[in-house]
Swiss-Prot record:
One of its GO terms (biological process) is photosynthesis. Keywords: Chloroplast, Membrane, Photosynthesis, Photosystem I, Plastid, Thylakoid. It is found in: Plastid, Chloroplast thylakoid membrane. Coiled coil: none annotated. It comes from Pisum sativum (Garden pea). This is Photosystem I reaction center subunit N. Belongs to the psaN family. It is a peripheral membrane protein. Disulfide bonds: none annotated. GO terms for cellular component: chloroplast thylakoid membrane; photosystem I.
C-alpha cells in the first residue's frame, strides 16, 4: 500500500 510504503521510506530515512 502507499501508506505502508511511506512508513518504510520514513524508516529508511532514519
Amino acid at each position: 500500500s502507499v501508506f505502508d510504503e511511506y512508513l518504510e521510506k520514513s524508516k529508511a530515512n532514519k
